[in-house]
Amino acid sequence: MNQDWLFQTETSICQLRTAGVLVRDGKVLVQRDGVEYALPGGHVKIGETTVEGLVREYKEETGADVKVGRLLWTEECIWTWNGKLAHDLAFYYQIELCHSGDLPDTGEFIPQKDNGRIVLGWLPREQETIPNFV
C-alpha cells in the first residue's frame, strides 16, 4: 500500500481522493493553499479503502485521529490542471475527532503537519457553502 491511486501521462492525470467534513461549533475545518480552499484529505493508496485512506491522511495532515461516519457525497471532476487533462474521483465523508482537543480553534490558520505551505483553519458554516445534510 505504498503507491497513491494516481496515474499520470504526459498529457493527463487521474486520481482517487478522499476527504472529511469535520463540523464543530458551527464551523467547518478547511485547508487553504494560497487562495484555494479544500476539505482536508488526500490520495487513496492502492489496496486501501477510501475510509482507511481518510483516517491515514487526516493523521498525516492534522495529527488527529478521526472516526469516519457516513458517506456524504461523491464527486467526479474533469478539468485542465497545469496544462494536463485531470480526472478526479473523490469520496467525502462525515467525520468526528476521537479527541476533541486535537484540533483547537484559535481563530488562526495553522500549518499542516506534512506540508507547511498548506494551512488549516475553521470557517463559519454558511448555508451557501455547506449542504444541509452535513
Predicted regions and their residues:
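Short hydrophobic/aromatic beta-strand or adjacent loop that forms the aromatic wall/cage
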Residues: Q15-A19, D88-Y92, R117
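Short, solvent-exposed loop/turn segments at secondary-structure junctions
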Residues: A38, E75-T80
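Active-site-adjacent beta-strand/loop module that shapes the phosphate/pyrophosphate-binding cleft
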Residues: W79-T106
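Nudix hydrolase/Nudix homology domain
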Residues: D33-Y37, D102-P104, E108-V134
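Acidic, metal-coordinating catalytic segment for phosphate/diphosphate chemistry
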Residues: M1-A19
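Short, well-ordered beta-strand micro-motif
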Residues: L22, Y92-E96, G121-P124
